[in-house]
């Protein structure tokens, strides 16, 4: 029991469990004995009905859209705290992850197009390497435990949130044909209610969560990625202390173990089970996976590092306190973990064209993401000293 308590007290424990869940999913998805059970579990229908409102999704979508909204709620709370009281409190510090994220989307897309521009079909996948899987990137960073400066973790969170918002906008503009304007209207009203609650000084977390559920439902029905609702709710929950209590900090404390030990491992288990059937290493010579690998492994760190360097040189932004430019460069490598978001964009880009293209895209995403994770982790492990 003492060893178990020591493990769960470790800052790295959540990352370790997430990686184990991902490996288990890969094994089960590619084993003849367990692949059927694994896919049946993910396809299990779960229906929620309240009056005339009905949400009928399989288990995978409930995990990705509902549980991950809770994860993004926690991320929103942590980033808001740092924006108001911590390492992103000044305008120039807050601008830093925004500029980094822009570079981290533009350069990978351009590198991909350098390989695929001549092919009108594969060219449609230009957004694949522009995405970052925030859950896995943070999971790899968590493996380093207390070595990681808090400001560096917050920088990665803020960068990845902006990256995800960019990916959501790209999907809505270029890969979605059926946005529901009525649902987006309901979402806008819900956001307005959250703003009014915050301005009026409402401090009951439950009220914000209730409006957040309405917002989440509206965003889900609109065709936009529903996890966005979690970030928005997190930004509106009050942070200021009154009588020694802060609603945002209290909720952050409550959510952290649930996210670290249940939601993220479950997300990893549900999404890391990529079937390698039909995927061969011969496909690595194709321009599609080569473009994705180049975008994730080279384009992400290059774009983030270059735009950060320009921002510092032009005095548009400041480094987060307690971090170095070299650490920012390595975070750029971790942002090359595109994984689930990249696979999702690939399915939208090629799903109606050729299933073989999706297999090639998966190969490129896996190679690029795993390489980014291993290189980023190894480099940070060498560069960061263990805390005493």
Curated annotation (Swiss-Prot):
Variant or mutagenesis effect after changing residue 163 to C: Loss of both Na(+)/H(+) and Li(+)/H(+) antiporter activities. Abolishes ability to grow on high salt medium. Cannot bind Li(+)
Periplasmic side of membrane: 32-58, 117-122, 177-180, 223, 273-286, 351-357
Subcellular location: Cell inner membrane
Stated consequence of mutating residue 65 to N: Does not impair antiporter activity. Mutant can still survive in high NaC1 or LiC1 medium
Residues in compartment: Cytoplasmic: 1-11, 81-96, 131-154, 201-204, 237-253, 311-339, 381-388
Effect of mutating residue 225 to C/S: Slightly reduced antiporter activity. No effect on pH sensitivity
Marked site positions, Important for pH response: 241, 252, 254
Annotated phenotype, changing residue 225 to R: Shifts threshold for pH-sensitive inactivation. The pH dependence of Na(+) import is shifted by 1 pH unit to the acidic range compared with the wild type
GO biological process: regulation of intracellular pH; response to alkaline pH; response to salt stress
Entry membrane topology: Multi-pass membrane protein
Catalytic activity: Na(+)(in) + 2 H(+)(out) = Na(+)(out) + 2 H(+)(in); Li(+)(in) + 2 H(+)(out) = Li(+)(out) + 2 H(+)(in)
Outcome following mutation: residue 254 to C: Affects the pH sensitivity. The pH profile of the activity is shifted by about half a pH unit toward acidic pH. Causes a shift in the pH profile toward basic pH
Annotated GO MF terms: cardiolipin binding; sodium:proton antiporter activity
Induction conditions: Expression is induced by Na(+) and Li(+). The Na(+)-dependent enhancement of expression is augmented by alkalinization.
Quaternary structure annotation from Swiss-Prot or TrEMBL: Monomer. Homodimer. Under routine stress conditions, the monomeric form is fully functional. However, the dimeric form is much more efficient in conferring growth resistance under extreme stress conditions.
Free-text note regarding domains: Displays a non-canonical transmembrane assembly, which is termed the NhaA fold. A unique assembly of two pairs of short helices connected by crossed, extended chains creates a balanced electrostatic environment for the binding of the substrate ions. Is organized into two functional regions: the pH sensor region, a cluster of amino-acyl side chains involved in pH regulation, and a catalytic region containing the ion-binding site located approximately 9 Angstroms apart from the pH sensor region. Shows two different conformational changes in response to pH and substrate ions. The first change is induced by a rise in pH from 6 to 7 and marks the transition to the pH-activated state. The second conformational change is induced by the substrate ions Na(+) and Li(+) at pH above 7. This movement would cause a charge imbalance at the ion-binding site that may trigger the release of the substrate ion and open a periplasmic exit channel. The transport mechanism may involve Asp-163 switching between forming a salt bridge with Lys-300 and interacting with the proton and/or sodium ion.
Identification of the protein by name: Na(+)/H(+) antiporter NhaA
Organism: Escherichia coli (strain K12)
Record lineage: Bacteria, Pseudomonadati, Pseudomonadota, Gammaproteobacteria, Enterobacterales
């Amino acid at each position: 029991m003492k060893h178990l308590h020591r493990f769960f007290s470790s800052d790295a424990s959540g990352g370790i469990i997430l990686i184990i869940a991902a490996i288990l999913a890969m094994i089960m998805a590619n084993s003849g004995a367990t692949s059927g059970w694994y896919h049946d579990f993910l396809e299990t229908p779960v229906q929620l009905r309240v009056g005339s409102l009905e949400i009928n999704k399989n288990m995978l979508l409930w995990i990705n859209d509902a549980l991950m909204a809770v994860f993004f709620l926690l991320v929103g709370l942590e980033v808001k705290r740092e924006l108001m009281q911590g390492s992103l409190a000044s305008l120039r510090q807050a601008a830093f992850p925004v500029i980094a994220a822009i570079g981290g989307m533009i350069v990978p897309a351009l590198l991909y197009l350098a390989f695929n521009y001549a092919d009108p079909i594969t060219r449609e996948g230009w957004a694949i390497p522009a995405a970052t899987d925030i859950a896995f990137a943070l999971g790899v960073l968590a493996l380093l435990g207390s070595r990681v400066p808090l400001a560096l973790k917050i920088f990665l969170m803020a960068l990845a949130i902006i990256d995800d918002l960019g990916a959501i906008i790209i999907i809505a503009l270029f890969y979605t044909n059926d946005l529901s304007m009525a649902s987006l209207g309901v979402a806008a009203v819900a956001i307005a209610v959250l703003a009014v609650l915050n301005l009026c000084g409402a401090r009951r977390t439950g009220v914000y969560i209730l409006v957040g559920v309405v917002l989440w439902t509206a965003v889900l029905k609109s065709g936009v990625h529903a996890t966005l609702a979690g970030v928005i709710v997190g930004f509106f929950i009050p942070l200021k202390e009154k009588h020694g209590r802060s609603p945002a900090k209290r909720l952050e404390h409550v959510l952290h173990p649930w996210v670290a030990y249940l939601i993220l491992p479950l997300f990893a288990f549900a999404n890391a089970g990529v079937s390698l059937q039909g995927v061969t290493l011969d496909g690595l010579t194709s321009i599609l996976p080569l473009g994705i690998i180049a975008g994730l492994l080279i384009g992400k760190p290059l774009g983030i590092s270059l735009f950060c360097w320009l921002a510092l040189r032009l005095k548009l932004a400041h480094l987060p306190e307690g971090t170095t430019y070299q650490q920012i460069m390595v975070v750029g490598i971790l942002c090359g973990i595109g994984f689930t978001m990249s696979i999702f964009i690939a399915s939208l880009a090629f799903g109606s064209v050729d299933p073989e293209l999706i297999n090639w895209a998966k190969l490129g995403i896996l190679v690029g993401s795993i390489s980014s994770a291993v290189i980023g982790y190894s480099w940070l492990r060498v560069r960061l000293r263990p805390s005493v």
